[in-house]
Amino acid sequence: MSKKDTEHDDDFALFKEAVQGVKKLRQDTIIQQPKKNTKQKEIKRSNREASDSEFYFSDEFVPRLNEEGPTRYARDDVSTYEVKRLRRGVYVPDVFLDMHGMTQQEAKRELGAMIAYCVKNEIHCACVQHGIGKHILKQKAPLWLAQHPDVMAFHQAPLEFGGDGALLVLLSIPEK
């Protein structure tokens, strides 16, 4: 046996001798809390996110949008000045959603998730890139956006944000 092992054994023996006769304390000051059901919270959160992403968009609803000129929309309570600022690119989008190659269902889900994300993180302007392609998403995206209560206005994006293939979206963020 090495010198190191004997020192270790001596230390262990001294400790054992020092704590001989000690009784285990009964824990009486801290009350154990039952474990929280994190699975249930996760299910509620995912259900809420799913309802955020798909609740507002209907393919049957057709809002009144201008047929002439660039694609644009504003709620009744939004001034035309805000739409003009969107058109000019004064608002710089903080979030970009690229819907190229998505199906209509995927695009709806992602659009709803993007709006929910923007509202949660207090982001006022986002860019939705629907592309030009076969014009399916280009026609549907404005119809879906006009249905959402958090969308104040949208306008065809300036060239630096996608031009004909994108929309700048102005969102209302509820005060907390």
Curated annotation (Swiss-Prot):
EC number: 3.1.-.-
Domain Smr: 97-172
Keywords, alphabetical: Endonuclease, Hydrolase, Nuclease, RNA-binding, rRNA-binding
Keyword rRNA-binding on entry: yes
InterPro entries: Smr_dom, Smr_dom_sf, SmrB-like
One MF term in the entry's GO annotations: rRNA binding
Root EC class: hydrolase
Region annotation (Disordered) ranges: 29-51
Residue runs in coiled coils: none
Gene3D superfamilies tied to this protein: 3.30.1370.110
Family: Belongs to the SmrB family.
Function of the molecule: Acts as a ribosome collision sensor. Detects stalled/collided disomes (pairs of ribosomes where the leading ribosome is stalled and a second ribosome has collided with it) and endonucleolytically cleaves mRNA at the 5' boundary of the stalled ribosome. Stalled/collided disomes form a new interface (primarily via the 30S subunits) that binds SmrB. Cleaved mRNA becomes available for tmRNA ligation, leading to ribosomal subunit dissociation and rescue of stalled ribosomes.
PANTHER family referenced in this protein's UniProt entry, alphabetically: DNA ENDONUCLEASE SMRA-RELATED, UPF0115 PROTEIN YFCN
Protein's name according to its UniProt entry: Ribosome rescue factor SmrB
Native species: Vibrio parahaemolyticus serotype O3:K6 (strain RIMD 2210633)
Lineage start: Bacteria, Pseudomonadati, Pseudomonadota, Gammaproteobacteria, Vibrionales
Gene that encodes it: smrB
